[in-house]
Structure formats: structure tokens, C-alpha cells
Amino acid sequence: MEDGRSTFKVIIIGAGVTGLTLAHCLAKACIDYVLLDKGIVAPSFGTTITLQPHGCRILHQLGCLDAVLASCDVMSGAQCRDPSGKTFASNDFFRVVKKFTGYDTRTLDRKVFLRTMYEQLPDQSRVHERARVEEIIEDNEKTRVVLQDGQEFVGNLVIGTDGVHSKVREIMWDNANTAKPGMITVEEKRAMVTQYNAIVMACSPVPGLGSHDMEVTSNDKFSFLLLCQPDWISIIVHNKLPEDQQCTWPTRRRYTESDMEALVSRILECPITETVVFGELWKRRLKAQMISLEEGVLEHWFFGRIVLAGDAIHKVTPNSALGGNTAMEDAVTVANTLHTLLAAHPNKKPSTVELQDAFRDNYQNARMDRVRAIVKVGGDLTRQQAYDGWKRYLIQRWLTPIVGLDTLAKNIAGLCVTAPKLSYIDFEEKRGMLNWQDTVAADKELEMHHENVGGVRAEYHKSKWLLTSADWSGGFEAVFPQILGVLMVMWSSVWLFHLAFSRHCISGFGGEVWRTFGADNETSCVAK
């Protein structure tokens, strides 16, 4: 009899972070696949990818981690700075995250990461470059992908990992609205919004900047994010767009060198730290480009025999460094879903209905809440770090140092340890003070099995210091808002008292608010 896994074929479209990770996952599951990309593997555009601990765990499981780590160094501390470059919060951020998860946080050139993932594939002949998709035709249990040059690929499932401007998504939308008119609404098509753009660049090292640190420098409606490595620095300048320049799909902003230079000219003199201004980074730039920052989550992640993953269905702003890692989570969950479905019926290929049921329950519905929370975390961080409104200014400038970056690091760790891994590969994962949620669940299931077999009741105890991921399953939202709420009430009471009894209310805390947002602002740089 034929093995369903060996005869079922997946066509992956898009050889970015999601597509290459998925290719590795399918190879480990012995599921046949091809990977198509309209361009080349590892293009030069883009700057970096930051691998959070859960991304590193996935790479560890796939056997790619050592090769990736050979091309990058660890991250260590973090500093938050005001418009003058002065520090108002700092800690060993990434060391704290590692303490709770067991894995480092790494940042490396995106091109190097993609090239490494490609070279680690067991069969590179499955990857086809310059394969631009023209049409996807579903015919009973098969799908045909037709390229612009007339070449065709036939499989049983298409997975679109072709990014935020996905061609596969547009085809899926058309198929869905043809079969079920009104299924994909205008609201969903416009769910990804662009309110910020960014300059993404890399430069050579600058004296005065740490070689393993993250620097966040806030300004009025823009911010600088630096990820420093010994040989280079990754920089992202997040810039709030005027309302008349904000947009949704299908508008796609394309920026020229002149557009980028215009923004640079307004921020050239802005401090990054107390000893470095942005102009010094710009002079040392190795590459730079200006891009739109889309953000949002779509409702429908599949239809028929087409499934979407990664930026094609959700997009997060880069401040949280969760976008690529969330895409890798998608790849893992898609592979787990397929592996489970094919293993349950090893002698036949699943029907379209069976595929849709599996991806609805085990992929779309299972991940929707988590992905929405991640996108919200990224958006909130972008706006807080850019002082986008007085409430966000208060959170970033005044509540962050009170709450402490250790709390933020712990919550990032909590978000990491609730991420998925492949269900069909055993490996010795690293562990920290927080246990990985899926590992804890598997251990408990095994223990319950032993109970049933041996009639022995196991008692589970949580160490005061060894917390399970359930304690942090809400990520940022588990602790941060409650603390902020209490602090806001406390601060409001003090501020009202100050207003009522002081004739010099614009001083101290209030003075900084006035200086940051006032018309006579002389200390902060403003990009309009």
C-alpha cells in the first residue's frame, strides 16, 4: 500500500523565512514538497532577522541552529533613551530572557539567514527560483500551479508563504468569493493598515555603542531602534505617517532614494545616545532602504486547497522582533497539522473537506488569539517608543523605568515558552526557569498514561522558582496592563494634587511633557 505522506505533495510558494522553515519541517516529516519563489533565494534587500528563544528552539529541533549561530553573536543589554539620548531605563534584557527560556536571542543579516537555511536543506533541487506564479487551478484532489513562463507544478496542497503582498492570497480570495460570494469582505481585505514607514539600514560599528546591546531612542512620532553586533549595527527608524499618507490594501507605498533622503535630512542631527547622533550612523551605512510597515491580522487563513502562512496573513511592526519568529511558528503548526492528518490515514490522501477541517481547528483557530496578541504587542511598542500620543509617552518614558525592563523581559520570555514546536521530532531542548508549555503538556500526558497503566497517582508540584509557562501564557498582557493601571491611578492622584496646590505646575514631570510636545520644543527632533 502507498504511504499517504510520500504520495501527498505540497507546493510552497515563497522562499522567505516562512517558506524555508516549512520546507525543513516537511522534509523532517517525509512529506513531499517543492518550493517556488518569484525571485532568488536570499535576496539582498532587507536588513536583519532577530531570532527570539522560541525561534532558536525551532531551529534547534530542525538541526539548523548551529549553522545559523555560526553567523551571528548574542544580544545582551538594552537601553531606553529620551530625545536627548539620555538613558531612563536599562538592564541585561536578553540575559534575563535567556535565564527564563534557556536560549539566547540572536540577530543576523536576513540574507545570511535565508542562505544558511537553504544550504541546510537535505535536497536543494526542490527549490525553484524565478518561478513567478500566474494561476492556481484546483481540480478535485489536485492543484496545478501555472507559472508565467508556462511551466506547471502539480500537487495536493498549495501553501502561500509569499509575504504581505501575496499573490497566492489574492488567488485564494478570488476562489473563495467565486464559490461563496461575500466570504472575503472589504473589511478583511483592508485589515492590514499602514500608519508607519521605516528606514531599515545597517552600518559599520560606531565608537560609543555597545557591541551586543539594543538601543531604543524615543522622539515625537518617531524612534530609533539599534541592534548592535561586533562587526555591524542594524538600525530601524520608525516614522509615523501623516493621516493623508496612511493606507490599506491594495495601496502599496514605494519609496525612492529621494524620499529616504528627505526623512534623513530631518533626523540627521538627532541624538541616539549621549555621544552619538544619527548622522554618524548614516555616514557609515552599508545598505539602507525605506519601506512601509503594515500591521494587522486576516480572518481567513485557508480556502479549498490553498493555505496561507506568515506575512500573507499577519504582519507585525518590527519593534518587538516577533514577526519572523511568528512566521516560523506558522510553519511548525502547518507541518504538525499535515503530519497528524496524513498519519491518521496512511493509506489514502485526505479529501478537501478533511484538509479544511484540520486547518480550521488545528491551525487557524488554534493560533488566531496568539497571533492577534503578538500583532498588538508589536503595534503598542511601536507607538510607545515613538511617543505616539500622551498616554503612550507616559507609558514609555515614565512607567517603563518604574515597572522595569526585567518585567518586560520576563513577559517576552512568557510569550516565547508558549510557542509551538514540531510534534514529531524528539530532541534535547534547552530549558530555563520557565518550562516550555508544550513540553510540560507532553510530560503530563505521559505521566497520566503511566498512572492509568500502573494505577499510580502522580502529584505535580510547581517549584517557587521553576514556573510553568501557564503562569505567563498571556505574554505582555498577563501582567503589564494591571501594573500600569495601578501606577496610572497613583500618578493621576499625585498630579491632581500638584495642580491644585502648586502655582508652578509646569515643572519636573510636567515640564518634560511640555518640552516634548510643546510648540517651543527645542530639545527633541521632530520628523513631520
UniProtKB/Swiss-Prot annotation:
Q: Which residues cross the membrane?
A: 479-499
Glycan-modified residues: 521
| SS bond list | none
State the InterPro entries in the record: FAD-bd (IPR002938), FAD/NAD-bd_sf (IPR036188), FAD_mOase_fung (IPR050562)
Top EC class per UniProt? oxidoreductase
Gene designation per UniProt = DEP2
Q: What happens when the gene is disrupted?
A: Impairs the production of depudecin and accumulates an epoxide-containing metabolite of slightly higher retention factor than native depudecin.
Annotated function: FAD-dependent monooxygenase; part of the gene cluster that mediates the biosynthesis of depudecin, a highly oxidized eleven-carbon linear polyketide that acts as a histone deacetylase (HDAC) inhibitor and makes a small contribution to pathogenesis. The reducing polyketide synthase DEP5 is the central enzyme in depudecin biosynthesis by yielding the backbone polyketide chain. The monooxygenases DEP2 and DEP4, as well as the uncharacterized protein DEP1, then act as tailoring enzymes to modify the intermediate polyketide chain into depudecin.
Name the cofactor(s): FAD
Where does the signal sequence lie?
1-23
The UniProt entry's GO CC annotations, sorted and at most eight, read:
membrane
| Record protein name field | FAD-dependent monooxygenase DEP2
Q: Which organism is it from?
A: Alternaria brassicicola (Dark leaf spot agent)
